[in-house]
């Protein structure tokens, strides 16, 4: 087993069975290739990323710790699991943080003593058909930090993170946000409550002895950034020096020539 090895190119051998694999640590010849690379291969940064600016911009794939960022505030774009956990960590480290929230599902990390992965399994949600063609991939906001916990955007805001809508434009030192923050939060809440309802029904139907958890349905009051969302932000005036693009990945099989 070799670790830290990047596969650069793989192609079928000429005239005989097998493959020639070029890697960052030399060439390997093998009879079989298993491409278990998953969907998270190539970091994606949208075309709206401002070019040649004074901002420090990185994809979430290249973020490791708060200390790698320059002094100043941070705009985190994307509120899936990566974006939420990065924003949370930065705020805890003393950074002023803005979090751009798009459409998402927000499952409970745990409910009635069971992890959300267990619930997805017993409720058949791993095999569920998509509700809308073209929406096969849904951003999921869930955290594994500090032992794992349910993502609560209102709680993040009450702690000091400013929530904004989907980022539409980033240019000339200004960020423009969509008028969709309230709807995105509402739909995330809806997906959360739907899973709780389905879990409760499953417990009743199967006669399981799992403790009730009524507090899971309690939401904090809406923070000001949600009731009166920003639609435009002057980055310099806000003291923002960094942008983290937590905007997902694309598949990339250009290395595989078979």
Regions found by a protein language model. Give the residues of each.
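Flavin (primarily FAD) cofactor-binding/catalytic cores of flavoenzymes
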Residues: 1-258
């Amino acid at each position: 087993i070799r670790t830290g090895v990047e596969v650069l190119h793989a192609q079928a051998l000429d005239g005989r069975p097998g493959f020639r694999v070029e890697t960052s640590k030399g060439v390997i010849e093998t009879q079989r290739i298993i491409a278990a690379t998953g969907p998270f291969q190539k970091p994606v940064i949208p075309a709206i990323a401002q070019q040649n600016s004074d901002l420090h911009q990185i994809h979430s794939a290249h973020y490791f710790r708060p200390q790698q960022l320059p002094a100043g505030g941070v705009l985190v774009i994307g509120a899936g699991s990566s974006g939420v956990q990065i924003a949370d960590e930065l705020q805890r480290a003393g950074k002023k943080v803005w979090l751009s929230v798009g459409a998402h599902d927000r499952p409970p990390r745990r409910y009635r003593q069971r992890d959300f992965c267990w619930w997805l399994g017993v409720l058949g949600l791993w095999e569920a058909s998509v509700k809308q063609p073209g929406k096969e991939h849904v951003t999921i906001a869930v955290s594994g930090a500090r032992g794992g916990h349910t993502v609560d955007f209102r709680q993040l805001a009450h702690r000091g993170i400013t929530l904004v809508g989907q980022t539409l434009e980033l240019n000339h030192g200004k960020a423009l946000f969509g008028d969709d923050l309230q709807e995105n939060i509402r739909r995330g809440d809806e997906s959360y409550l739907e899973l709780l309802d389905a879990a409760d029904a499953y417990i009743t139907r199967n006669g399981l002895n799992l403790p009730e958890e009524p507090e899971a349905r309690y939401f904090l009051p809406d923070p000001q950034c949600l009731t009166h969302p920003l639609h435009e932000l002057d980055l310099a005036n806000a003291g923002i020096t960094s942008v983290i693009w937590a905007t997902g990945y694309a598949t990339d099989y250009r290395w595989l020539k078979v």
